[in-house]
UniProtKB/Swiss-Prot annotation:
Primary residence: membrane
PANTHER family given in the database record: PHOSPHATIDYLINOSITOL N-ACETYLGLUCOSAMINYLTRANSFERASE SUBUNIT Q, PHOSPHATIDYLINOSITOL N-ACETYLGLUCOSAMINYLTRANSFERASE SUBUNIT Q-RELATED
GO cellular component, one term: glycosylphosphatidylinositol-N-acetylglucosaminyltransferase (GPI-GnT) complex
Alphabetical list of InterPro entries matching this protein: PigQ/GPI1
Subcellular localization: Membrane
Organism: Mus musculus (Mouse)
Pathway: Glycolipid biosynthesis; glycosylphosphatidylinositol-anchor biosynthesis
Disulfide linkage: none
Gene Ontology biological-process entries: GPI anchor biosynthetic process
Membrane topology reported for the UniProt record: Multi-pass membrane protein
Name of this chain's protein: Phosphatidylinositol N-acetylglucosaminyltransferase subunit Q
Length: 581
């Protein structure tokens, strides 16, 4: 079996010393973490490794010797390194050396505790793999996508081996917590040996994050307790709360903020990434909301919107009146049932007059309402968009009423015709068994059924025309609201922090590794460079996408068409937990 030695590139120019790392026996791999420089006291090295092993739960040990032949005499150094194997006993004992003045490397693996002196790995069987310790420490290896069963075994084995390498470097972070000003008795070389990589602003933010999170968590817990009060569960408050998109969005953001400012430490990188994505999403949402707020309050745009709202509502009502008058005549040359046509037309015209009166009654207060609604943009653009969606729903409530009236009347006739059609065929619907059974009917039942079927058939075109027109209007309103909800869901669920990491620091999101051959020479160990393969953007979106608000059900095209054909009510006034008709 080939012995694999993972060596950090930051230690390639280190002075001679000891190789400190972890031996992975199941894979015949040695992960080098640091180099201990001369001079040192062996007992102090053992104490340091015991402390690191206790803190990180990683079996760190001295795996061998490192010889960088630049200044030391070769003979004296070689004699000294040979004697270290008796002090720090480990099987296998690695002897890694970089030739003086050249780029040639040599690596041997001996087993001093074995009785057979021939138990030595030739250099051809030792593979030297270089890796970037900083990138490997900061990255997180993701599991592979679902593969066919024939490839699953090999992929799981290789992924498990890489996971051990990544996990060893990540858990050994306590070994790297020293800098060039730390006067320890043991001097190490690793990726932070030249100084700890840190930022003053980051350190200040870490210091202040604890008290700030504790304060905000207390405030959010009070708000959550107030929102969970039993008063909100009483009718009609519970009904209004479940129907308004604004309440759903505020509840969704409250859960996000409670999770972000929770004092509990993230248990794994996935949870930490989720917190970061939520924080960036909230900050972007608030920033966009403040931009919208500044735009609304500049140049008196709220007053302009209020002055334009009433004429627009009057124009919509006027167009609806013209449409109803067209339907009450002979629309497109169709022969309608005049009596039913006049009844339905006057019924809907009366509702339009009521709606116009309601709009004119509210016109003096529209500017004040819009001003207070504009202030809600400081809570985020998603809250402002949700309020805008609710305003559209309220302003088009008469269209919704027309749609409900027409849909219920059309649905009643469809189900009546289907029942009477089963009566002609000697069938009936068995409610208990949910199936159609045979049934015998009397002559009077057949006569009344025939009469009712004829009446419903002749009245169906008039009802269907009104239902078709108001359904198209309702679908137009739903399309506008759907686009608004789509934008809200995009802001809520887009993993902006993960996408930013993938763009700026792709090694942080690792999907795997690739190897590049550095040297392949007879009599020398094969030298490879391990590089991180970043996660693709599609996988980043799939793995880190945040949950949506989910306040409205999502219908498939087949379900939507079936509901439209049979006159059943559709999105958005039905919630997921509601019963179906």
């Amino acid at each position: 079996m080939v012995l694999k030695v993972f060596f950090p590139t930051c230690c390639a120019s280190a002075d001679s010393g000891l190789l400190v790392g972890r031996w992975v026996p199941g894979q015949s791999s040695a992960v080098i973490l640091a180099v201990v420089h001369f001079p040192f006291i062996p007992i102090q090295v053992k104490e340091l490794l015991a402390q690191v092993q206790k803190a990180s739960q990683v079996p760190v040990a001295v795996l061998g010797t490192w010889c960088h032949r630049q200044q030391e005499p070769q003979e004296s150094l070689g004699n000294f390194l040979e004697g270290l194997g008796t002090i720090f006993s480990h099987d296998p004992w690695l002897q890694l050396c970089r030739e003086r003045g050249t780029r040639l490397w040599s690596c041997k693996a001996t087993y001093p505790q074995m009785s057979n002196p021939l138990d030595m790995h030739p250099e051809e069987q030792v593979m030297l793999i270089f890796y970037d310790q900083r990138k490997l420490l900061l990255s997180w290896l993701h599991p592979p996508p679902v593969l066919p069963a024939c490839q699953m075994g090999d992929t799981t084995a290789s992924t498990g081996g890489l996971a051990d390498i990544f996990d060893t470097v990540a858990r050994s972070e306590v070994l790297f917590r020293n800098d060039q000003f730390d006067e320890r008795p043991v001097r190490l070389s690793h990726w932070q040996s030249e100084g700890v990589e840190a930022s003053i602003l980051v350190e200040l933010a870490k210091r202040a994050s604890g008290p700030v999170c504790l304060l905000l968590a207390s405030l959010l817990s009070l708000i959550s307790a107030a929102s969970a009060c039993r008063l909100w569960k009483l009718w009609p408050l519970s009904f209004i709360r479940s129907k308004l998109s604004t309440c759903e969005q505020l509840h969704h953001r409250l859960k996000h903020l409670s999770f972000i400012f929770s004092t509990e430490k993230a248990q794994n990188p996935m949870q930490l990434m989720r917190k970061a994505n939520m924080l960036v999403s909230v900050l972007l949402d608030v920033a966009l909301g403040l931009l919208l707020l500044s735009w609304l309050h500049s140049n008196n745009r709220i007053g302009q919107l209020a002055n334009a709202l009433v004429p627009v509502a009057d124009r919509v009502a006027e167009e609806l009146q013209h449409l109803l008058q067209w339907l009450m005549g002979a629309p497109a040359g169709l022969k309608m049932n005049r009596a039913l046509d006049q009844v339905l037309g006057r019924f809907f015209l009366y509702h339009i007059h009521l709606w116009i009166s309601y709009i004119h009654l509210m016109s003096p207060f529209i500017e004040h309402i819009l001003w207070h609604v504009g202030l809600s943009a400081c809570l985020g653009l998603t809250v402002a968009l949700s309020i805008f969606s609710d305003i559209i729903a309220l302003l088009t409530f008469h269209i919704y009423c027309f749609y409900v009236y027409g849909a219920r009347l059309y649905c009643l006739k469809i189900y009546g015709l289907s029942s009477l059609w089963r009566l002609f065929r000697g069938k009936k619907w068995n409610v208990l068994r949910q199936r159609v059974d045979s049934c015998s009917y009397d002559l009077d039942q057949l006569f009344i059924g025939t009469l009712l079927f004829t009446i419903l058939v002749f009245l169906l075109p008039t009802t269907a025309l009104y239902y078709l027109v108001f359904t198209l209007l309702r679908l137009l309103v739903i399309t506008v609201q759907g686009l608004i909800h789509l934008l809200v869901d995009l802001i809520n669920s887009l993993p902006l922090y993960s996408l930013g990491l993938r763009l700026c620091r792709p090694y942080r999101l690792a999907a795997g590794v690739k190897f590049r051959v550095l040297e392949k020479e007879a009599g020398r160990p094969l030298r490879l460079l391990m590089q991180i393969n970043p996660l693709s953007y599609n996988h980043v979106m799939h793995i880190y996408r945040l949950p949506r608000c989910g306040c409205h059900p999502k219908h498939s095209w087949g379900t939507l068409c079936r509901k439209l054909v049979f006159g059943e009510l559709i999105y958005p006034w039905r919630q997921r937990e509601d019963k179906q008709d």
